[in-house]
Amino acid sequence: MTIRRVEPALARRQADWIVAMEPWLSMGFRAVPLGRWLSRRARAGCVLAAVHKRAILGIVVIQPEVLLGTFIALLAVRPQAAGQGVGRALVARVEHDSFAQRRWLYVSSDSRNLAAARFYRKLGFERVARLPGLVCDDRIEVLWRKRRP
């Protein structure tokens, strides 16, 4: 598996499988607007993909230079690749790139997504806030952060 930057057209095409998964499905995310956003972020060099044999297994989208750190705006792993270290590898790459210049790495997760909470805790993130209405009016996001070693 390799981690590489993604071109805008390829980033846009990932939206279909992302919106079919939780938590994006129950939050009402739609493929076309998400695809446009992914394409814009890719043009800015902010989309990385985990690739194996030319297949994208997962992607991470970052927003650099946020609050003395980098914010992981989206992390998604294809269901068939879950549990194979794809998410861990993507976060590790973002950590490496971010911690070279920044003090913090941030991410948020839906408070209902207990698997995400376990995942981020296991990677050394600490929960720092609950943010009602950040992504959807009826949902609560949990803000996580990790300090540069």
Question: What feature does the model see in each segment?
Answer:
Residues 77, 83-96, 118-122:
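Conserved acetyl-CoA-binding loop-helix of GNAT-fold acetyltransferases
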Residues 5-74, 78, 91-93, 97, ...:
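Acetyl-CoA-dependent GNAT
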